[in-house]
Every structure is written in C-alpha cells, then in structure tokens.
C-alpha cells in the first residue's frame, strides 16, 4: 500500500470541511487462505446513499457470453484445433483504478500521520461503493486501448478486429 500511495495524508481540517461528507472509517479484514492469512484494508462506506444505484456494481458478463467464448475457443478453424482460452485473476483489482472524486477516510492506527490527520484516496479501496464499477471501467478502457472492441450485445465482451474473441 505504501509503494502505491493508495492515499495521501492530509490535515483533518481540510478533509471534513464539507459537512455533507460522511467520515469513512477503515478496518483490517483477515481471511484464512490455503497459503496463510490474507489481510485486506476495507473501507466502511455505509452512508453512500442510494442516489446512483447504476454506478454501484461492476458489469458482469451474462452466461450466454461465457458460452460464446467457450464455443469459439473449442471450434476448429480451417482444420486447426480450437483456440486457447485463458482466464486471469487480477490481484488487488480494486486498487488499480484512480479515485476521480474527493474521498477522505480516517487513517488506520498504524499509518503515518498520527492524530489530526486523515487520508485522501488516490486509488479506490475495497468497501467503497463505486470501487467495483471503477475497476470495470478501468479494465474496459485498457482493453479498448489495446485494440479490442466492445461487443454490441454485451458490453463486457471484447472482440479483437482479427475475429478472435477475448
């Protein structure tokens, strides 16, 4: 977290100057995994409101899109075996997109800064309501920049102009 500068330390006087801004707290969540315990700093964004429900969730592909990918990968093309189908798991996905809003949080106890300081987010943390959608938008932007075209029927299905589904 320190190498990525997920947040910038600021004086509290500037963080909550706007009375409409809720004070966002954070806490560590430990999960037992096969390789040991994984700790994750999670925001407790309870008072996000329901003003913009469309922006809360990342887009996910419908089952039909997954079936299309698998059938395209398994289909023989000009006598050759099907294509490779690879899946990836992006580690710390929510920490990749930059935070485009002014979002302030209380610092965890072990963070630099001490009392009288808060953190302004540079990148999203798990637990913030818009984080999943921001990751989906960030990922889509990277694919489009790499030459993929967004599908017409499914916005999360990307196709390379050469005809290869990705």
Predicted regions mapped to residue ranges:
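Short, intrinsically disordered, charge-balanced linker/junction segments flanking boundaries
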Residues: 161-166
């Amino acid at each position: 977290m320190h190498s990525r500068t997920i947040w910038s330390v600021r004086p509290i006087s500037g963080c909550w100057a706007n009375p409409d801004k809720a004070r966002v707290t954070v806490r560590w969540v430990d999960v037992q995994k096969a390789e040991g315990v994984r700790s994750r700093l999670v925001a407790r964004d309870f008072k996000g409101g329901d003003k913009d429900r469309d922006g809360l969730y990342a887009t996910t592909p419908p089952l039909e899109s997954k079936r299309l990918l698998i059938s395209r990968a398994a289909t023989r093309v000009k006598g050759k075996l099907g294509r490779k189908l690879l899946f990836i798991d992006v580690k710390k996905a929510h920490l990749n997109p930059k935070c485009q809003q002014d979002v302030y949080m209380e610092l965890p106890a072990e963070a630099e800064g001490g009392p009288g300081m808060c953190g302004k987010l540079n990148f999203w943390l798990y637990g913030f309501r818009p984080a999943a959608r921001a990751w989906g938008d960030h990922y889509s932007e990277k694919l489009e920049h790499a030459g993929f075209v967004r599908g017409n029927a499914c916005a999360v299905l990307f196709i390379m102009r050469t005809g290869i589904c990705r």
